[in-house]
């Protein structure tokens, strides 16, 4: 009798352990995604795409990390599998990390905003503090390019992750000069008319945000990642075709519920500007786009060597986005 009770207890324990193990495996199989930087309205596209992909079987866990540096550290220590919102050029070339970008998400679209009472031109910023998003970010690259173009030298180039955070710092007066993305610039100008000035800046064609993962992970999880890339490209194209689409999807999917009313009211205007200026490329990246990145990031020092000598295949796996383009073309 005791033996039977023992077997029953053992079987129950084993069954529970099997269920627990299966549950842990299911959790472990989630694609762990790291979003570099605070969630701002320009990241609404990937949030909608993640919801679309989830409905199609893409199981993921999203972590919003404070900065590019923290996100890359989590990536290097295998705490996350996929990074959204920055690039891996320095990681691949200098640290020899086996990683590939697989879709271009956003192009550089930042404007230099200064406190008008302190500065009227780039020359006024010589010897002054300037604030950018993060080390190796597009904003840091642009700041150093403006130093060279205007023959000035900033006292310090300091890091404050997140354009909305820098926008609020401008409004509080704790900083006086920075790069902001378009929605944050619009927010600052509306909040304090006449107090801030946008300085002239040259146009650049390079990735501000891409999506990347380690090559072994891409090879093992191509099916899941293809679902995500398909969704990203679909949402980008629908948003560019009609900015009202992304606003309606935000409301339907209940995304960014705590977005301030003034920012929510400005969504359509932002995405119209984004569509007109090509901030979200309809193609998701190709060899020509990567070569533009090489030119920009070698000029900045993030990549070394001559742009013409760098190989696309060393930094990018374009097969996923190429497949997504074919699928979208076939459904027209």
Residue spans of the language-model regions?
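Amphipathic, soluble alpha/beta structural segments
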Residues: 86-95, 104-111, 262-266, 317-332
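Bacterial N-terminal signal peptides that target proteins for export
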Residues: 2-13
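Predominant activation on well-ordered alpha-helical scaffold segments within soluble catalytic domains
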Residues: 28, 47, 144, 186-189, ...
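Conserved C-terminal helix/tail region of periplasmic/extracytoplasmic solute-binding proteins
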Residues: 291-332
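Short, glycine-/small- and polar/acidic-enriched structural segments
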Residues: 29-162, 167-172, 176-182, 196-205
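Sec/Tat signal peptide C-region and signal peptidase I cleavage site
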Residues: 21-28
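Secondary-structure end/capping motifs
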Residues: 221-305
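Pocket-lining segment of extracytoplasmic ligand-binding domains
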Residues: 87-88, 165-258
